[in-house]
Amino acid sequence: DATPGIEALAELVASYDPRIRLFSGESGCPAVLEWAHALRYHEWSEYSQAKWVARRMANDWMMGIRSSIFTFVDLQYPNMQQSFGLLRTNLFKEVVYKRPSFHTVQHMVNLFRPELRSAGRLNHESNTPRRLTVAGIERQKDGTLVGAVVWQNDRIPSDNLAFEPIELWIEGLSLKDPVLIEMITGRIYALPKYHGHSGDGRMKFTGLPVWDSPVVILERSALPEGTQTRERQISGSTRDMHF
């Protein structure tokens, strides 16, 4: 986890000039096992790639860092064809299909638009042994806390598509009509009333499906204008992952 080092760098840079903004630079993830370049020797899949991209973008957004996702298409080297692309290409330099990571980036960019800003890490409690990141989402215009982005951060993203239902208490959050957004498919799910209730300055979610990729709890009114939602409730299973 490079986050502590990045935060230390941001603090150092701000001590010289707070106007300087950090940039993530060339960062990306393969979609298959690679024998060269970054993140090699690990059996990546197109789904674990999408999870990695979503986590990287969410973490950068939480810290106020501009993201650069490497790369848009698969690069062709003299000795190999890379798999880092959001678009799968062939040796004829033709686009074959859009990877799940392509849709993930679309959904992240569409949701985390300029009207919303990071509220940083939120204090939380949960009944899971997994380590979580919980970052607040607030409106730019008035600083109202309108949601949170949550993911398991203690392991390399896997290609397992199962969610873990947990109990989660988030400090300072109070939502009237929350929805749950899965950032790879972009699907928006209704959260029934028993899933979330507020009290003692925090909000509790019961049976909340989380995994090693960001899910977003958001006030319905904070969705992008024109977003169509359905009253389908998330099942917390692989059925939720089908495009």
Stretches with model-predicted labels:
Residues 20-22, 66-68, 147:
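Beta-sheet entry/capping signal
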Residues 124-175, 214, 218-223:
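Carbohydrate-binding surface patches
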Residues 192-243:
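C-terminal beta-strand-rich structural cap/linker in extracellular carbohydrate-active enzymes
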Residues 2-9, 45-54, 101-102, 162-168:
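Well-ordered, non-membrane alpha-helical segments in soluble/globular domains
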Residues 28-112, 116-131, 144:
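Aromatic/acidic polysaccharide-binding cleft in carbohydrate-active enzymes
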